[in-house]
Amino acid sequence: MEMEILYNYDTIIIGGGLSGLNTAYDLKKSNFKILVLEARNRFGGRTDSVKVGDGWVDAGGQWLGTNNPNLKQLCKELKLETYKQFYQGKTVFDIYDDGLIKSFDESSPNFDLCEIGLGNINPIIRAIKEVMKNIDFSKCSKESPIMLSLEKLTVSEWLRVCGYGESVKFFNWFCKMSVASSSDDISILFLLKYVNSINGFESLFISDDDCTESDRIIGGSSMVSERIVSYLKDDCKLNCEVTLIDQISHKNSRLIKITTSNNENYYCRNVVSTIPPMLLKNVIFKPDLPIEKQRLKNEMEMGNTIKVIVIYDSVFWRDQGYNGKSQSFVGPIYQSFDNCTNDLSVKSIIGFINGKEEIKYWYSKSLEERRSAVLNQYSKYWGPKALNPIHYIERNWSLDKYSAGCFMGVCKSGDIISQCNNYYTQPHGNIHWAGTETSTQWYGHMEGAITSSKRVVNEILKNSLNSKSKL
């Protein structure tokens, strides 16, 4: 009898980040009875906008790229405005073995890797592009010899095998900046899969109005979640960590029972899980997941990043002709960006400490030691005013229980992509899968999260039409 009373949802979505909330948003517009269960005490997942005075800073994901149609359309629908990331002026390059620090204008028509002394990278990129032409990333196959061979090598190993050992330092930096993992911690196949999902290398190397970090949302990226939550109203709940998903037979159909850590039970016909792969190990599934999905949850890892936000009382770097962007092989900040709000109510620079070993090293230091190292690095680039911020903020995403890191799930060398990747989005009974890690487009980005939600909504709508099972 209890089952009859509680069986009142078409679909329950686990996770109140961008993919989960947009899944709920689209299903509710189609008159589905839905519920979002979020484990945290806030919505937004790996986006988190923090109020600072009259403005904000984004402690999590914050950028839209030019080729992010789904996210841009959603912002338009939610009446959210965007503004351009500030790139006018010189970028600092701290990448030279002799310790010299140079600056270049990336908007110059003549700017390229050769100008900054990295011309030796161009042949490697061309070689990688040739390799990518022979891979069908839409069908990661255990029958593909090239995929199997590439996946057995880390990025560093592949470079050395191919005779590009002198470029390991650059690609180690590149991997940290793009997927928050070192070139020793991910397979070359995973890196190529990621690069393919964002339409190639070019937009990662040079920052301009067409790059992957071209636009920001006024009010912060969390505004997307806030607007959707205001639409969903009581159809989303916080502090509901899911511990059990049990598919049971009921009246000749499959009923799903969801149990949370506070012993609440919910019943529905469909579940959408947006939990990152490596966190699925915290949930009991009945019946158990197929072996391929079990391998994904047990073997995938999350990238590691500390996002550092330094707030100042002036935009002194702009006044000196700099754009706040830096690229460093030295650290502790390996990449930084101007992080000012559109109205300059908050004047700040964000920086990233990325990679497993880097996080381990810098988090063994005190907060004051990290702060001092970051400010001293910035003072080398933009002068003594960098030593006197009005606020210093850190977010170590590796310490976040419900993210376990950032920016995205990554794959080490082995065979997990070629053996298991095609299984990740396949429904398990009436359990469907979304989240940026399930997206073949803009993997790891906010756009990837929205794209995955579009896919899973189409799955559920199609199933509903076939079975006429909507409540």
Curated annotation (Swiss-Prot):
Cofactor: FAD
Modified residues (S-8alpha-FAD cysteine): 406
Domain of life: Eukaryota
Alphabetically ordered keywords of this record: FAD, Flavoprotein, Oxidoreductase
Catalytic reaction(s) noted: a secondary aliphatic amine + O2 + H2O = a primary amine + an aldehyde + H2O2
Enzyme Commission code(s) on record: 1.4.3.4
One example GO MF annotation: monoamine oxidase activity
Keyword set includes Nucleus: no
Pfam families given in the database record: Amino_oxidase
UniProt-listed InterPro entries: Amino_oxidase, FAD/NAD-bd_sf, Flavin_amine_oxidase, Flavin_MAO
Disulphide linkage map: none
Protein family membership: Belongs to the flavin monoamine oxidase family.
PANTHER family cross-referenced by the UniProt entry: AMINE OXIDASE (PTHR43563), FLAVIN-CONTAINING MONOAMINE OXIDASE B-RELATED (PTHR43563:SF19)
Annotated protein name in UniProt: Probable flavin-containing monoamine oxidase B
Taxonomic source organism: Dictyostelium discoideum (Social amoeba)
